[in-house]
Amino acid sequence: MKLWGGRFSKNTAALVDQFNASIEFDQKLYKYDIAGSVAHAKMLAHANIITKQESQLIVEGLQSILADIEAGKVEFQLELEDIHMNIETLLIDSIGEVGKKLHTARSRNDQVAVDIRLYLREEILEICELIKQLLITFTDIAEKHVDTIMPGYTHLQRAQAVTLGHHFMAYFQMFKRDHERLLDCYKRVNVMPLGAGALAGTTYATDRVFLAKELGFDAICENSLDAVSDRDFIIEFNNTASIIMMHLSRFCEELIIWNTAEFGFIEMDDAYSTGSSIMPQKKNPDLAELIRGKTGRVYGNQVNIMTMMKALPLAYNKDMQEDKIPLFDTVDNVKGCLEIFNEMIKSTTFKKENMKKATKEGFMNATDVADYLVKKGVPFRSAHEIVGKMVLHCVQTSKTIEDLTLDEFQNFSPTFTEDILEVIQIENCVASKISQGSTSPTNVLIMVNQARVFIEEVLS
């Protein structure tokens, strides 16, 4: 029998039960649903809506149900629609008529809203911890490779030499922002909707502040219509999750490229690579490719929820039942990708000699030659033109800038003196970057030390 069946003269069709039910996926919320119900039962007694004895009986019954679920003793019923009705039915079956008082001053509309918020705030903190571990890994690798020279790219064309440590600290900044965004999102997740009823509030003198304290919320939703219809916090989380996945995908794309024979910058560990069913020689970066692929899946979840919400009038609509699958999927994929990426990158071997060798081609010291002229008094645009002609000469004669003699330099400008031959050495080009945040080993080490302070003082 449906707990809402009094108004109906016949049972719903079996096909309707199957189509309407969400228990297949919202059972994931069982412990949050029970936590919300325990707090609600305590509040009902606190507000003298039910007796303390009744509240205690309900709380004990709910705790027993929680233990049974976690012991695998409960089989949820599809005909009961969702996790809320399943647990309430189990409670009534367990403690009798008193169990029917639990839903006083509550609707499934505010009940599911609090369940999702309880679930999501816990998951946000878990994702923050995974990002923290990744930031530690990035910092460790950056410190180890503070002076490992490699090509830096724009347009995927060799541009200027950088250090591998600098590259990792760039990603440190990206994921640091992700961590900050998650904590900011948490503020809007950690607001309590329970007590809003179906949409208009209740006629009972409930204490929503008591509920918020019981459940660890920072504040209550201030408008009952908004409380039950708001899914902004899910959309905001999914957007933040999409940015996290974008950052993972960007790094995975680089690793996939670096892992090719054409680049040869890295070798992925056998434990984090796969083979081919037909080509015996293959060693594929499948995990990086999967993370890149799952990024599109998370993006799709974001579009899913925004499209679902775009034309919904106030307040609750059944469409909103569909918010959970994309939310759960996003959470699971972000956590899984962060965890596997961290282990994969820790086990990766960086081929320092190949990276440095790649900086010998592509005229990656050309900007340094132009800067040299500027420091000697040549206007930058004039210096740019001089060095451009020098590069063209090198291309036409199959030379690098390092191959040029002092006489050849002076053919392009009399400003050049013998010290240019030291300036153009790639190690000196990297070391000469003295601006804050630049790629020199000295600056990268400063970044690493600042990162360690941030991890220790802010994230611990």
From Swiss-Prot:
Family, per entry: Belongs to the lyase 1 family. Argininosuccinate lyase subfamily.
Any one GO CC term of the record: cytosol
Gene Ontology MF annotations: argininosuccinate lyase activity
Organism: Alkaliphilus metalliredigens (strain QYMF)
Main location per the UniProt record: cytoplasm
Alphabetized Pfam families for the sequence: ASL_C2, Lyase_1
Chemical reaction(s) catalysed: 2-(N(omega)-L-arginino)succinate = fumarate + L-arginine
PROSITE patterns hit by this protein: FUMARATE_LYASES
Name of the protein: Argininosuccinate lyase
PANTHER family per record: ARGININOSUCCINATE LYASE
GO biological process: arginine biosynthetic process via ornithine; L-arginine biosynthetic process
Pathway: Amino-acid biosynthesis; L-arginine biosynthesis; L-arginine from L-ornithine and carbamoyl phosphate: step 3/3
EC number of the protein: 4.3.2.1
